Amino acid sequence: LIQTSMGAAKYMGGYKLCKALIEELVESMGITVPVAIHLDHGHYDDALECIRVGYTSVMFDGSHLPVEENLEKAAKVVEFAHANGVSVEAEVGTIGGEEDGIVGDGELAPIEDAKAMVATGVDFLAAGIGNIHGPYPENWSGLHLDHLQKLTEAVPNFPIVLHGGSGIPDDQIQAAIKLGVAKVNVNTECQI
C-alpha cells in the first residue's frame, strides 16, 4: 500500500502523475505483489479526482466538517468509488495534529458517529482514539484502548485504521491490533 497525500501529490505534479510514477516504480523494480495506490486524508474533490485517475483506494477525510455533512459526502464518495472498483476509508472523531492543512484536536470518535459512518458503506474506518499526527509530546497519555474496544464492539469485524502510528509504543500498537485495528499508518518517522 503506497499512500500519497494531497500536499505530496500537488508537489509532485498531480494525482495522475503520482499514479504513473508509482506504476513505473513497480514495473521497473519487478515488484510482483499487488500494490494499492491510496489517497490519505483527502478532501471530497480530491477523493473523486483520485478515483477518476485510477487510484485503488481513497481516504475521504471530512472529520473537520459537521457530522451530517461528513456522512453525506462520505456516502457520495462511496457510491462513486464502488462503481469504479475503489475502496474507501473515512474518518470520525479527529486525529490530533496536522496533516495537509487538516488540523485535528484529537477527540475520541463518538461511537454513534462511527456506526453511522460504517452504514454509509465505507470499507475502512479511521477513528480518533488518542492518536495524533506528527511527533508525540512527552506528556501524551497513550491510546484510549478502552474506547477502541467499545468502538470495535459497536462495529464488529469492521477494519479500523490507526493513523499517527509513528511514535506509538509497540505494545500499544499490538494491543490495538488485537482489538481490531487492521491498518496502521506511519509517516512521521519516515521524514524525521
Question: What is the meaning of each model-derived region?
Answer:
Residues 162-166:
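Glycine-rich beta-strand-to-loop/alpha-helix junction loops that act as flexible
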